[in-house]
Amino acid sequence: MSVALFCGPPPAVSFGCKDGRGRKGMVRSKDIVRQTVKPPAHACRLIGWNKYPGSVVPTNSSLSPSPTALDDEIELDLSPFLIIYKDGRIERLKGTTVIPACPEVATKDVIIDPATGVSVRLYLPNVVDLPSKKLPVLVYFHGGGFVIENTGSPNYHNYLTLLAAKSGLLIVSVNYRLAPEHPIPASFDDCMAGFNWVVSHSAGPAPEPWLARHGDLTQILISGDSAGGTVTHYVLLRADAGVIEGAALVHPYFLGSKRLENQTEEDFEFHEKLWRLSTPDTEGLDDPLINPLAPGAPSLAGLKCKRAVVFVAELDFLVERGRMYYDALVKSGWGGKAELVHQEGVGHVFHLSDYSGDVSVDMMAKMVAFLRGE
């Protein structure tokens, strides 16, 4: 059995628009596939955020607007992530393509909760030469601002396939529910459920044979990028002591009510809107779920792992928040070993789209070394 980086072409149908229209000029086209998911009520009670009208209008200005024009009126524009229309449709502009799991290269999908539909994608590296060897297990949480991406997204599928091949770890990637259809804390709850599902395999009959046969449940690590890094912190606070060996937070999506010097006003306002859309009952950007350093947030001394690494990128608008998190962790009295990896000249989650660049290769090497405990 071999591990391949690519498992074949993506499905013939790509769900969601990817035509790069930007914020305006919204037109209907028979070639565009739209998601038509009705959002929860809170997503329609928006307080005047970016209500741009659609551009489909009658050619004769004396005519009344057509139903099509009315359908395309925008309630909230969060390009390049998603657009919410006044008729209730949610259109995701990226992060919706799914690459099927590939059993022939040791990847597969498993539904862990039929009630919610939460699933995981497993990545098993080549074990032909050492069939009885138990592999450390990495539980991974993908990014996407809590509103886009999934375990089958090309960037994540290809990156985790490569990571499994190079590290020799059995990887379990959690496919959690997205906002705004499923407001936070649904995503956090789903990721915690995915983590607990993995841990449960150490306490009796194991429902998943790959984990039972090949997983070393005494060596569990967790990791996530962007929003997945936020979830990683959440899980570290709630896991049982002694269960997690190590944690890697990659460009973690931490926010705060104070705009930092490296953050533009546009970026700051965009992510505030995104967070409020995802979390209707939020306290704002100092909600401990998104700002682990906010007043009243749980102490970082309570993280349940032996070692941790925080990756930050120089050109990422989140870089200073990541640094602040690392500094606070070191000063918290936490008893583990912490490491900060700062990479220059690159931006947010650059490593998901570039595997061959020098900085990406260096990052992969550092990640593999951390996961292996080297």
Swiss-Prot record:
It comes from Tulipa gesneriana. One of its GO terms (cellular component) is amyloplast. It catalyses: 6-tuliposide A = tulipalin A + D-glucose. GO terms for molecular function: hydrolase activity; lyase activity. The gene is TCEA-B1. It is found in: Plastid, Amyloplast. Keywords: Amyloplast, Lyase, Plant defense, Plastid, Transit peptide. This is Tuliposide A-converting enzyme b1, amyloplastic. Its EC number is 4.2.99.22. SUPFAM superfamilies: alpha/beta-Hydrolases (SSF53474). The lineage of its organism: Eukaryota, Viridiplantae, Streptophyta, Embryophyta, Tracheophyta. It comes from the Eukaryota.
